[in-house]
Amino acid sequence: MQKLIIYGGKPLRGSINISGAKNAVLPIMAASILTDKLHITNVPKLTDVSTMKGLLRSHGADIETIEHQDEFELIINTRNINNFTADYDIVRKMRASIWVLGPLLTKYGKAKVSLPGGCAIGARQVDLHIAVLKAMGAMIEIEGGYINASSKGRLKGTHFIFDKVSVGATINAILAAVLAEGETLLFNCGREPEIVDLCNCLIKMGADIIGVGTSEITIKGKDALNKVSYKVLSDRIEAGTYMLAAAITKGDVKICGIDYHIIENLALKLIETGIKVVPIDNGVQVIYEGKLNAVNLETNPYPGFATDLQAQFMSLMTLSSGVSMITENIFENRFMHVPELCRMGADILVRGNKAIVRGVEMLKGAEVMASDLRASVSLILAGLSTNSKTVLHRIYHLDRGFQDLEKKLSNCGADIKRV
């Protein structure tokens, strides 16, 4: 099994180009079911993208992949969809597989989707997905680990209030509503940039969506959607991770190809710690200026601080001057990186959904193991900060969400290699 070997202590200097957003491209790929053909550009080279390609092909889609140096183009032809079951063998690998449920159901009136897998960071139930589809007239049962869904005729527009903000359920509801009969009003929706990107793609396809980027979305269903070409936005989580890498290594890095406003909440937190963050053309520059203050942090739905950056930010706080409190409000069990950071000398105490982080002067290299995607990269950041050797095991998580990570870090001076 592959592992990463990191020799830390080298400040990162240079520039890093950000790839397409994983959490945007996956629902956009699922949206191809709603039309006959969809051309997607700026597609990141990730195993989750390969998994979604495999899932769509299992439904009968024909996919042409055009490879460029830093991205893929996908041309997805879905005219011959003939299988409406998403099997466990594929779905277990990735939670985003649940996003074929809404498109299959709204276009073909039936879908059978295995309960999903992905990172082991809590229950992340599908109850809200099922509830909103039932409100649109779907008949749904869960049998043998599968969601069996059907409808008599088209789904019907509805008014639905999400009990809590759910990115995944918001996406499935939008994907179903764009071809439903009548008007759908969704309340307490996710506002994430990736949801906005999906909506922009659907609007380009001919969907009628009002309220994009707000918590209240109105969708007037169409009979059909059009073939289009669409460029996926850049990945704010990847950008934020490299911003934190620059800070933890006491470096100076330009993060290129990202809109500042979608990473502003992280930028403001970094400024609060004493890190210099400067907006530049098409990106942001992060500069360590000799101090790192402890700050408190709470994860919340967008525009709050992203849960997908919590582990990386915690790595930074392990080296801060003082004590920080990190509160995880999105997922339970998302502190699985803490024992591994403590193996490296971090002083962290977990109490429920809160972690108390007491800054130490330096972390020490160690053999550590990744438990999920974001935890794995937090351990890389920790390893980069040390003056010794760190070995990271179970790195297959990384390839689900970070394209060319070792190359991008090495180009900025990191000593990191995969063996």
Curated annotation (Swiss-Prot):
Belongs to the EPSP synthase family. MurA subfamily. GO terms for biological process: cell division; cell wall organization; peptidoglycan biosynthetic process; regulation of cell shape; UDP-N-acetylgalactosamine biosynthetic process. One of its GO terms (molecular function) is UDP-N-acetylglucosamine 1-carboxyvinyltransferase activity. It is an enzyme of class 2 (transferase). Its EC number is 2.5.1.7. It comes from the Bacteria. Pathway: Cell wall biogenesis; peptidoglycan biosynthesis. The keyword Cell cycle applies. This is UDP-N-acetylglucosamine 1-carboxyvinyltransferase. Keywords: Cell cycle, Cell division, Cell shape, Cell wall biogenesis/degradation, Cytoplasm, Peptidoglycan synthesis, Pyruvate, Transferase. InterPro entries: Enolpyruvate_Tfrase_dom, Enolpyruvate_Tfrase_sf, MurA_subfamily, RNA3'P_cycl/enolpyr_Trfase_a/b, UDP_GlcNAc_COvinyl_MurA. It is found in: Cytoplasm. The modification 2-(S-cysteinyl)pyruvic acid O-phosphothioketal is found at residue 119. GO terms for cellular component: cytoplasm. UDP-N-acetyl-alpha-D-glucosamine binds at residues 95, 164-167, 308, 330. Phosphoenolpyruvate binds at residues 22-23. Cell wall formation. Adds enolpyruvyl to UDP-N-acetylglucosamine. The keyword Cell cycle applies. It catalyses: phosphoenolpyruvate + UDP-N-acetyl-alpha-D-glucosamine = UDP-N-acetyl-3-O-(1-carboxyvinyl)-alpha-D-glucosamine + phosphate. The active site is at 119 (proton donor).
